[in-house]
Amino acid sequence: MKHFFRLPTAFRPISRVSLRYSSTDTAQPKISKLKISFNKISESNSEKKDNLGSIDTRNCLSTQQDDKLSSTEPSKASLPPSLQYVRDLMDLYKDHVVLTQMGSFYELYFEQAIRYAPELNISLTNRAYSHGKVPFAGFPVHQLSRHLKMLVNNCGYSVTIAEQFKKKDVADNEANKFYRRVTRIVTPGTFIDEAFENLRENTYLLNIEFPENCMSQVADTSLKVGICWCDVSTGEIFVQQVYLRDLVSAITRIQPKEILLDERLLEFHIESGTWYPELVELKKFFIKYQKMPSQHRTIESFYGLFNLGGKEATERQLKIQFQTFTQKELAALRNTLIYVSNHLPDFSINFQIPQRQLATAIMQIDSRTSTALELHSTVRDNNKKGSLLSSIRRTVTPSGTRLLSQWLSGPSLDLKEIKKRQKIVAFFKDNRDITETLRTMLKKVNDLSRILQKFSFGRGEALELIQMARSLEVSREIRKYLLNNTSLMKATLKSQITQLTESLNFEKNLIDDILKFLNEEELAKSQDAKQNADVTRMLDIDVKDKKESNKDEIFELRDFIVNPSFNTKLRKLHDTYQGVWQKKTEYNALLKGFFVGDLGAKTFTLKERQNGEYALHVTGTASSLKKIDELISKSTEYHGSCFHILQKSSQTRWLSHKIWTDLGHELELLNLKIRNEEANIIDLFKRKFIDRSNEVRQVATTLGYLDTLSSFAVLANERNLVCPKVDESNKLEVVNGRHLMVEEGLSARSLETFTANNCELAKDNLWVITGPNMGGKSTFLRQNAIIVILAQIGCFVPCSKARVGIVDKLFSRVGSADDLYNEMSTFMVEMIETSFILQGATERSLAILDEIGRGTSGKEGISIAYATLKYLLENNQCRTLFATHFGQELKQIIDNKCSKGMSEKVKFYQSGITDLGGNNFCYNHKLKPGICTKSDAIRVAELAGFPMEALKEAREILG
């Protein structure tokens, strides 16, 4: 993930006041007063910002660009009101890209147009005004999402969006009919457009609340830190209090798209690792420094951001929940809620009840371990394909995939929950027909959480109401299906399934009403037409190239999306519409008989033209059209009104007639009234789901849970996985363990089968693994760590038999170090990472270490390796796998220096090489007791293509 560093910005720049400013008003924009108050609020911090080098984006331009700008830009006092508004926004949001809607375009102005137009690959030009030229660039409104991705995800900018709105009770032909206001500020953590498209991942925004003035003291690993993270696109929100030593593990588990920090921390550069080395991991993330809100704002003032089934119920549940939070958790929660509401001022936020996560309930996996084990992406190319998540994913719903990712990042420490998952997986594994039927049903389910959030935001198509209803209907069917098969379950599992599926019993009446009163077929057609139009716009097809005749539509009976029987008002509107339509039909028949039958025209059609005129379209021969012209020239009345020529050609006539004009306008007005009433009904249905947010989310959670566990059953059958025994012991016993991803890679390339190995660890013994280069030592270390993770998420594991005592923390020092510690040697980085293990591992932890001490001289490296091994065994007493090339040396030191008791606790195992005769050999990855005496480095060099002369020299030196 790209790190982007932000300079401080005032936390509440604009959301308290709705910015409204007409593009043609001559008065000074209202933003000016707001800006003054903003400066007063920020006055105490202004000197600090200057000292820290606060950057105005205008100063980022080249000298040549500055010269160009200064020579063409009008003075601020002479700017037209619309541009004055843009300039004031740019001054207020100095570190943001400002996109302002002007008609059907979003536009950039002044120095921002010069800077960002090339990055967006859009044309840069100048617009002339009475006092000079202004640089500007823009793109169509429908391309907003595409350009936001470029600005936010690719370039790492924050984007302020000012949308255009029509004033109420203002005629369309008035000049000052529009005003603009900031509707949202887009950052990686509030980029809802991207989140709604990327269904498989969470878009988490994380706030970290450090104790006041803690940076001025030496870092204390037992320092308590409050964190809050949320996904605005799903409504999930969590809080947790962690110790400083566990903070980075929590960040790694959450995988936030954006991290929010107090601007007061900026001067300490905490991501440099100077104050606390492990915080160097923050460099991997998008960091936003913000002026935090006043502590005087109570947490109760945020109740409006939640909907738990009515105002009273919401307040009651939140009060109970908030009482369980610590002060640091509440502070982090408050900061997060203000940030979200400030960045989405035009959106109705709808969070679920905040969930408190406990460090004692989740396995801690730091970022180095997550990377080394390739949990979410591969080390080599940072690709998701080939990762553990990719290898085990068999989920069929977006919510199931997100849940699987969350579980991999933070396996459970709750033995009861793990065993519950195992029982459900075992049932699905043994009953394949039931599993396949369940998964077929799950495939019909849409992403309920995100559809619900769309409704809350005032977004979401009417078709998504159908999708919501169908999904909830399927959830009821799933519940019924599983309950009908409980006879195959044991009593405990039967009770668990019954309790689990209770939430799937969503209110049937609401589902039935939506499916009864909404026209699903018409909605699907409308959606297809909209998507085709979007594709056309994306391809920049110029509709002006279409023929004129294609612009003018035959006036046909409209297909409406709500059943007229929904209410009396809609029924009456439809009855009136049908009555007018009948008149139109009769009128059309009369005119067709007149023009075609009496005057000899070829065709006659009633149409609505592109310009809104209701016209008669007649085609015919020259003689028949001449008759029509003569009739019109005589002002002959037809049913009390004359015909008038609107447009003519050699073969056509466009005519107007009062009756059709009146009928057309009446039909259009009725159509508009029906559409408005339908929109009200659609909003009513959306509101009913919003009012049942808690129930909808419970359904989504349960469906994701069932999807994930049933996917484990499918995986177990595919990959020959077994149910591990998970308990409270300190054991790790694996028989014929395998590495899932390596095994999958070998199988895909039709290479040799994977060599399985045993492992037996406890707190009072430690395995030292030796072997040649490429002998499989690192693979063995990783596979056992992965088996532990799989076991504690409730998945079956790749082996013949396994016993896993609950692991609270998983540590690794495997592979090359990340390039995060500037100006530090590889060995120094390895020592820092090893020290984290020695300081953090408990007797319930698992540590895998590879080649400790390799980055320095042989003697010193051996001493470091021995000291690490001894400390882990005697002090940490954690389960440890220790791979090294110093096997003989360590064995000798242990025998000479340590007691017999310690000597017996260290077990040495080796892999090796099998000679096949001549210069041929193969690796033997099967571990056996003993110490590998040589690493066969020369053979590896030979495989790598070393020149023969160099190989000969190496063999001679080796003797």
Curated annotation (Swiss-Prot):
<dbReference type="GO" id="GO:0006281">
    <property type="term" value="P:DNA repair"/>
</dbReference>
<dbReference type="GO" id="GO:0005739">
    <property type="term" value="C:mitochondrion"/>
</dbReference>
<dbReference type="GO" id="GO:0032137">
    <property type="term" value="F:guanine/thymine mispair binding"/>
</dbReference>
<dbReference type="GO" id="GO:0032139">
    <property type="term" value="F:dinucleotide insertion or deletion binding"/>
</dbReference>
<dbReference type="GO" id="GO:0008094">
    <property type="term" value="F:ATP-dependent activity, acting on DNA"/>
</dbReference>
<feature type="binding site">
    <location>
        <begin position="771"/>
        <end position="778"/>
    </location>
    <ligand>
        <name>ATP</name>
    </ligand>
</feature>
<dbReference type="InterPro" id="IPR045076">
    <property type="entry name" value="MutS"/>
</dbReference>
<keyword id="KW-0809">Transit peptide</keyword>
<dbReference type="InterPro" id="IPR017261">
    <property type="entry name" value="DNA_mismatch_repair_MutS/MSH"/>
</dbReference>
<protein>
    <recommendedName>
        <fullName>DNA mismatch repair protein MSH1, mitochondrial</fullName>
    </recommendedName>
</protein>
<comment type="subunit">
    <text>Homodimer.</text>
</comment>
<keyword id="KW-0547">Nucleotide-binding</keyword>
<keyword id="KW-0238">DNA-binding</keyword>
<feature type="transit peptide" description="Mitochondrion">
    <location>
        <begin position="1"/>
        <end position="21"/>
    </location>
</feature>
<dbReference type="InterPro" id="IPR036678">
    <property type="entry name" value="MutS_con_dom_sf"/>
</dbReference>
<dbReference type="InterPro" id="IPR027417">
    <property type="entry name" value="P-loop_NTPase"/>
</dbReference>
<dbReference type="InterPro" id="IPR000432">
    <property type="entry name" value="DNA_mismatch_repair_MutS_C"/>
</dbReference>
<dbReference type="InterPro" id="IPR007696">
    <property type="entry name" value="DNA_mismatch_repair_MutS_core"/>
</dbReference>
<dbReference type="GO" id="GO:0006298">
    <property type="term" value="P:mismatch repair"/>
</dbReference>
<keyword id="KW-0496">Mitochondrion</keyword>
<dbReference type="GO" id="GO:0043504">
    <property type="term" value="P:mitochondrial DNA repair"/>
</dbReference>
<dbReference type="Pfam" id="PF01624">
    <property type="entry name" value="MutS_I"/>
</dbReference>
<dbReference type="InterPro" id="IPR007860">
    <property type="entry name" value="DNA_mmatch_repair_MutS_con_dom"/>
</dbReference>
<dbReference type="InterPro" id="IPR016151">
    <property type="entry name" value="DNA_mismatch_repair_MutS_N"/>
</dbReference>
<dbReference type="GO" id="GO:0005634">
    <property type="term" value="C:nucleus"/>
</dbReference>
<dbReference type="InterPro" id="IPR036187">
    <property type="entry name" value="DNA_mismatch_repair_MutS_sf"/>
</dbReference>
<dbReference type="Pfam" id="PF00488">
    <property type="entry name" value="MutS_V"/>
</dbReference>
<dbReference type="GO" id="GO:0003690">
    <property type="term" value="F:double-stranded DNA binding"/>
</dbReference>
<dbReference type="InterPro" id="IPR007695">
    <property type="entry name" value="DNA_mismatch_repair_MutS-lik_N"/>
</dbReference>
<comment type="function">
    <text>Important for mitochondrial DNA (mtDNA) stability and repair. Recognizes and binds to base-base and small insertion-deletion mismatches in mtDNA. ATP binding and hydrolysis is crucial for function. Binding to a mismatched base pair attenuates ATP hydrolysis. Also involved in proper sorting of mtDNA during mtDNA transmission.</text>
</comment>
<dbReference type="GO" id="GO:0005524">
    <property type="term" value="F:ATP binding"/>
</dbReference>
<comment type="similarity">
    <text>Belongs to the DNA mismatch repair MutS family.</text>
</comment>
<keyword id="KW-0234">DNA repair</keyword>
<dbReference type="GO" id="GO:0000002">
    <property type="term" value="P:mitochondrial genome maintenance"/>
</dbReference>
<dbReference type="GO" id="GO:0007005">
    <property type="term" value="P:mitochondrion organization"/>
</dbReference>
<keyword id="KW-0227">DNA damage</keyword>
<dbReference type="Pfam" id="PF05192">
    <property type="entry name" value="MutS_III"/>
</dbReference>
<keyword id="KW-0067">ATP-binding</keyword>
<dbReference type="GO" id="GO:0140664">
    <property type="term" value="F:ATP-dependent DNA damage sensor activity"/>
</dbReference>
<dbReference type="Pfam" id="PF05188">
    <property type="entry name" value="MutS_II"/>
</dbReference>
